[in-house]
Regions:
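Conserved alpha/beta core segments of nucleic-acid transaction machinery
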Residues: 1-16
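Helix-rich C-terminal "collar"/helical-bundle subdomain used as an assembly and partner-interaction module
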Residues: 12-96
Length: 96
């Protein structure tokens, strides 16, 4: 996957989160679960300044760190990733 494709993919994820579209967000996770979950958390972290309101960045960092830690212990990585995105959806302001 090229860098442009990955960047566009994260834009799709942030759009689904901003729109509070659980179905689209979950579909994104399902389509990307073959990636290492740690790389998804890192990808969101790397793209946050482009997509997240500045006042929400500290909250996003805490959520990502928490779910990345939990990732080491969970049986179902997809469920953990969807839970993370749901918490971001509920607590982080995404730029329009």
């Amino acid at each position: 996957i090229s860098g442009a494709d990955i960047s566009d993919s994260y834009t799709q994820l942030f759009t689904a989160i901003r729109e509070k579209n659980f179905k689209k967000m979950r579909a994104w996770v399902v389509n990307h679960i073959d990636l290492e979950p740690a790389s998804i958390y890192r990808g969101i972290y790397d793209k946050m300044y482009d997509h997240v309101a500045p006042n929400s960045i500290p909250q996003l960092v805490l959520i990502l760190a928490d779910y990345q830690y939990k990732n080491a212990f969970v049986a179902d990585h997809e469920l953990n990733l969807v839970a993370c995105m749901t918490e971001i959806m509920a607590n982080v302001e995404i730029k329009s």
